[in-house]
UniProtKB/Swiss-Prot annotation:
Superkingdom of source: Eukaryota
KW Phosphoprotein (keyword) present: yes
Family affiliation: Belongs to the ARR family. Type-A subfamily.
Organism: Oryza sativa subsp. indica (Rice)
Induction annotation: By cytokinin.
Entries under Gene3D superfamilies matching the protein: 3.40.50.2300
The name this protein goes by in its record: Two-component response regulator ORR9
Protein task: Functions as a response regulator involved in His-to-Asp phosphorelay signal transduction system. Phosphorylation of the Asp residue in the receiver domain activates the ability of the protein to promote the transcription of target genes. Type-A response regulators seem to act as negative regulators of the cytokinin signaling.
PTM entry text: Two-component system major event consists of a His-to-Asp phosphorelay between a sensor histidine kinase (HK) and a response regulator (RR). In plants, the His-to-Asp phosphorelay involves an additional intermediate named Histidine-containing phosphotransfer protein (HPt). This multistep phosphorelay consists of a His-Asp-His-Asp sequential transfer of a phosphate group between first a His and an Asp of the HK protein, followed by the transfer to a conserved His of the HPt protein and finally the transfer to an Asp in the receiver domain of the RR protein.
Gene designation: RR9
In-chain residues carrying the UniProt-annotated modification 4-aspartylphosphate: D75
Amino acid composition bias (Low complexity), ranges on this chain: 158-180
Keywords for this protein: Cytokinin signaling pathway, Phosphoprotein, Transcription, Transcription regulation, Two-component regulatory system
Any Pfam family the entry gives: Response_reg
Tissues/organs with expression: Expressed in mature leaves, and at low levels in roots, shoots and flowers.
Lineage: Eukaryota, Viridiplantae, Streptophyta, Embryophyta, Tracheophyta
Length: 201
C-alpha cells in the first residue's frame, strides 16, 4: 500500500545580498523547506505573478510558478523596492494577502519592526538569521493553511445554500403550473356536458 508523502512547504526568499541569500537558502533547506530565491522585490512580485502596480495575477507569468508559495521571507533594506514596500504590495493584493511574510534586517530599530508588524508582517528576524529561527516559520504557514481551508468551506457552504434556496422556487412554480392545469381540466369537464346537450323543439 503506497503511503502519501506530503510535499514540503515552499518558501520564497528575497535578498539583494548573495551571501545572505545563500545562508537563508541553506537554513531553509536544512529545515526541510522547498526554497526559491530572488534578489529583489520586483522579481519576487514577478515570480508571484503580480505586476508592481497591479492587483491581479499575470497570466503570462503564472505558468512559471509551478508550486504555490506558502511563505515569503524578505530582507528589509534592498535597493529599488524595500522589504517594507514588498510587504505592502502583498498585503494590498487580494490575490496574495494571505501568504505569511517574514521581514529580516541587520538593524534592530523598534520603530521599523513595529511598522512592519502593523502592516501585516508575521515575524521580524534580526540578521544573521539562525537555524532556530526556522522553527518559527511553520506555525505561520499552518495558520494560513487553516484560514484558507476555512474560507473554502465557507464558500462551498454559501454556494450550497444559494442553490438550495433557488430550487424551491422552481418546484413551487412547477407545482403551481400543474395545479392550474388540473383546475382548467375540471372546469372544461363541467362545461362540456352543457355545451353538447341536444335542444328540444
Amino acid at each position: 500500500m503506497a503511503v502519501a508523502i506530503e510535499a514540503p512547504f515552499h518558501v520564497l526568499a528575497v535578498d539583494d545580498s548573495l551571501p545572505d541569500r545563500k545562508l537563508i537558502e541553506r537554513l531553509l533547506k536544512t529545515s526541510s523547506f522547498q526554497v526559491t530565491t530572488v534578489d529583489s522585490g520586483s522579481k519576487a512580485l514577478e515570480f508571484l505573478g503580480l505586476h508592481d502596480h497591479e492587483d491581479s495575477p499575470i497570466s503570462t507569468q503564472s505558468d512559471q510558478q509551478e508550486v504555490a508559495v506558502n511563505l515569503i521571507i524578505t530582507d528589509y533594506c534592498m535597493p529599488g523596492m524595500t522589504g517594507y514596500d514588498l510587504l505592502k504590495k502583498i498585503k494590498e493584493s487580494s490575490y496574495l494577502r494571505d501568504i505569511p511574510v517574514v521581514i529580516m534586517s541587520s538593524d534592530n530599530i523598534p520603530s521599523r519592526i513595529n511598522r512592519c508588524l502593523e502592516e501585516g508582517a508575521d515575524e521580524f528576524f534580526l540578521k544573521p538569521v539562525r537555524l532556530s529561527d526556522m522553527s518559527k516559520l511553520k506555525p505561520h504557514i499552518l495558520k494560513s493553511r487553516c484560514k484558507e481551508h476555512y474560507q473554502q468551506e465557507q464558500n462551498l457552504q454559501s454556494n450550497s445554500e444559494s442553490n438550495n434556496s433557488s430550487n424551491p422556487t422552481s418546484e413551487n412554480s412547477s407545482s403551481s403550473t400543474s395545479s392550474n392545469s388540473h383546475k382548467r381540466k375540471a372546469v372544461d369537464e363541467e362545461i362540456l356536458p352543457h355545451t353538447i346537450r341536444p335542444r328540444h323543439s
